[in-house]
Amino acid sequence: MMPPTRLAGTLIPAMAFLSCLRPESWDPCVEVVPNITYQCMDLNLHKIPDNIPSSTKDLDMSFNPLRNLGSHSFSNFPELQVLDLSRCEIQIIEDDAYQGLNHLSILILTGNPIQRLFPGAFSGLSSLQTLVAVETNIASLEDFPIGHLKTLKELNVAHNLIHSFKLPEYFSNMSNLEYLDLSNNKIQNIYHKDLQVLHQKPLLNLSLDLSLNPLDFIQPGAFKEVKLRELTLRSNFNSTDVMKASIQGLAGLQIHQLVLGEFKNERNLGRFDKSILEGLCNLIIEKFRIAYFDKFSEDAIDSFNCLANVSTISLVHLYFKGLKQLPKNLGWQRLELVNCEFEQFPTWKLDPLKELVFSANEVRNAFTQVKLESLEFLDLSRNDFSLKSCCSERDLGTTRLKHLDLSFNNIITISSNFLGLEQLEYLDFQHSSLKQVSDFSVFLPLKNLRYLDISYTHTQVAFHGIFNGLISLQILKMAGNSFQDNFLPNIFMELTNLTILDLSDCQLEQVSQVAFNSLPKLQLLNMSHNHLLSLDTLPYEPLHSLQTLDCSFNRIVASKEQELRHFPSNLSSLNLTRNDFACVCEHQSFLQWVKDQRQLLVEVEQMVCAKPLDMQGMPMLNFRNATCQVRKTIITGSVFTVLLVFLVVVLVYKFYFHLMLLAGCKKYSRGESTYDAFVIYSSQDEDWVRNELVKNLEEGVPPFQLCLHYRDFIPGVAIAANIIQEGFHKSRKVIVVVSQHFIQSRWCIFEYGIAQTWQFLSSRAGIIFIVLQKLEKSLLRQQVELYRLLNRNTYLEWEDSVLGRHIFWRRLRKALLDGKPRCPEGMADAEGS
C-alpha cells in the first residue's frame, strides 16, 4: 500500500494541473441538436469551446465571462444563424468582431455593460434581422454603429440610457425595419426634427414602442403626415394633463394601431378622464387599444366619439362603472373587451359590429341576450356564464354568425339545435359543462360547421346520432369526456370530411372494429390518455389518409403479430410512449416490430418496459431476442424433464406390483416352491373352492398344497403385497377360477393381470383356467385379454356329474403334477389312484 505522504505528493500536483485546465478544453456544452444547436449557458467560459463544430447554427453562450470580443471572434462558425451573448460581461466589441457570420439572423446582447463599440463592431452581418441590445448602456442611437444593417427587421434597445428620440439618418437605409423598441429609456421630449427621417422616407411597416419613457412633451405637428404600423405609449405620463397634451401632439399621425394605457404594476394615473382622448379626433387610426385604467366612468365612453370610424377597439383591464350601453353612432366592426369589470352586462346597439370578443370579464349580473344583427364572430369565453337556453337566433340575435366561442364558462344547457345559426363554421364549448348535448341530434342543422370543440364538457356519449348533420366538419375535439361502458362505437357516420379527431382522456377501454369506417380523410387521430390494454390495429385499417396516430399514456401491453399489418400505409408518426409494455418472450414479435419501426415511432427511445419487474424502466430497444432463445431451450428442457419424470412415476405407479413381482422372481427363482398352486377366485365362489377344490386336491392322493388368501395370507401386510409375495412367489402354478363373479371383480382382474406378468417372467410358471359355468360372450369380451387366452388355450370346465367330475379331477391333478419334483411313493400312489 502507498504511504500517505507519497499519495498526497501524487494527488496535489494532479489536482493543481486539473485546476489549471480551462472549461473550454473539456466537453461542457449541451448538444441539443447534433452539429446544429449547442447550449453553453453559465459555464464560466472565456471563449467558445474547441469541441463546438463549425456547422453549428444556434449557439447559446449567455452568462459566461467573455468580457471582450476581438476581431473575428466567431470566424470558425460561418453557419451561425442565432447567437445569444446575454450577460457575458462584454465591455468592448472591436471592429470585425462578427466578421464571417454572413448567415447570422438573430444576435442577442442583453445585459452587457458595453463601454466601447468600435465603428465596425457589427460589420459582416449581412443577413442580420433581429438585434437585441437591451440594458447595454446605449446613450444615443446616433452613436450605435448599425447604419449598414440594411436587412434589419427588429431593433430592441429597451432599458438603456437614451435621452433623445432623434432617429439617425441611417434609418433611411433600413427599409426593412418593422419593429423599434425604445421602451424604458430616458426620453422626455419629442420634437419635429427627431422624426425628420420618417418625413423624408416613411417606414410604413414600422411599429414603435415608447412605453415607460417619462414623456413630458410632444411637439404639436411632430407626427404630422407620419405613417406607422403601430405606436405604443403605456405608463408614459405622470398626469392626465400631460397625457392629454401629448395625445394632442400626435395630431396628423396616420397609424394602423395605437396602444395607450398603463401596465399592471406601473400605474401613474388614478382616474381616467374623458377629455384625455379628445386629441384622437386629429389622428387617422385603424385599430385602437387601451389597457389598465381604473374608474373608467360612464361619461368617459363619450370620448370614444373621436374613435367612431376606427374598425377595431380593444379595451383591456378596465373597470366600467355604471356602463349600460355604448353610443349608437359608432362604426366599429370589431370590439374586444378582455379582463374588464362590469356592474351589469351591457346592451349592444352597434349595428355595423361584425366581431365581438367579450372574454375573461367579471360581470355581476347574468348574461342577457345579444341583439347584433350583423355579428359574424362572437367570443364569450372565460366569463363563468351559465346559460339556461342555448343556442338559437333568439338567444344571440343574429343569423349571420360564423364563429361562436362559449368555452371556459359554467353550465350551458342545449335546449335547441341551433335554429337560425345554420351559417356557423366554428363552435367551441371546451371546459364548459354541457347539458342535454347527447339527448338528441343537437348539431343537425349545422351543415357548414368545420370546427367543433366539446372537450372536457362532462359529456357522456350515449346517443349514436350525436354528430348527425355535420357533413362539412373537419376538426372534432372531444377530449376529457366519456362513453357508455367505456366503449367507442361508430358515432362518426356522417363525418366524411373529418381530418382531425381528438379522443384523448376519454377513459376508453375498447374501440369498435367499425368505429372509423366513415372517416376516409382523417389525417390526425389522438387516442392518448385512455385505458386501452392492447394495440388493436384493425379499427385503424380504413383510415387511408391517416398520417399521425397518438396512443401514448394508455395501458397497452403489446399487440398481436397479425394485427401489426393493418396500419394505414400513409402513417408517418405513431406515438406509443408511456404505456405498460410487457417485455416478455410471449410478445417477442411485437418487440421486434418496435425495433424495425424506429422511423415510424415517436421518441422510440422513451418506450420502456413496465413488466416484468426486473426489466422495469429498461428501454424496449434493449430487449434481446437471444434471451428468448435461451429461455425457450431452458423451458423446453425443463418441460421435457418434467414430462419424463412424470411418465416414469406413472409407469412405476402403474406397474409397481409388476416390478415387485420381477424382484421376487429373481429372489425365489432357485428355491423350492412352498405351494403347488395359488388360487385366484371371486369371494362369491368361495364355497366351491372350499368344498370341492381344497377338499379334493389337499386331501387327495397325491396331496397338493394350495395357497388361499383367507388362510395363508400374513395378517398386517397389504393385500397386494400378500398376493405377490405369498401367492405368486411361493407357488409353482396359478389356478384361475373363472366365473361371472370373477369377471365383474376388480381384484380378480388385478390378480389375473399380475399372473400374466408372473407367467412371462418365470419359465416354470403356468396358469390353469377353470371355468365354473357357461359364460355369455358379451360379458367375457369385456376382458379382452382373458377372452383371447380362453380361445387360444386349453382350460378345464366344471361339470357337476359323476363322469364329468372324474375327468375334471384327473386332468387337474395331471396339470399340477407337471413340473412337480418326483417322489417314488407319491408317484406310486398317484398311479394307484
Curated annotation (Swiss-Prot):
UniProt keyword annotation of Nuclease present: no
Subcellular location(s) per record: Cell membrane; Early endosome; Cell projection, Ruffle
Transmembrane segments: 633-653
Any one of the GO BP annotations: positive regulation of interleukin-1 beta production
Superkingdom in the source lineage: Eukaryota
Its biological purpose: Transmembrane receptor that functions as a pattern recognition receptor recognizing pathogen- and damage-associated molecular patterns (PAMPs and DAMPs) to induce innate immune responses via downstream signaling pathways. At the plasma membrane, cooperates with LY96 to mediate the innate immune response to bacterial lipopolysaccharide (LPS). Also involved in LPS-independent inflammatory responses triggered by free fatty acids, such as palmitate, and Ni(2+). Mechanistically, acts via MYD88, TIRAP and TRAF6, leading to NF-kappa-B activation, cytokine secretion and the inflammatory response.
Quaternary structure, from the entry: Belongs to the lipopolysaccharide (LPS) receptor, a multi-protein complex containing at least CD14, LY96 and TLR4. Binding to bacterial LPS leads to homodimerization. Interacts with LY96 via the extracellular domain. Interacts with MYD88 and TIRAP via their respective TIR domains. Interacts with TICAM2. Interacts with NOX4. Interacts with CNPY3 and HSP90B1; this interaction is required for proper folding in the endoplasmic reticulum. Interacts with MAP3K21; this interaction leads to negative regulation of TLR4 signaling.
Name assigned to this protein: Toll-like receptor 4
Species: Felis catus
Lineage, highest ranks first: Eukaryota, Metazoa, Chordata, Craniata, Vertebrata
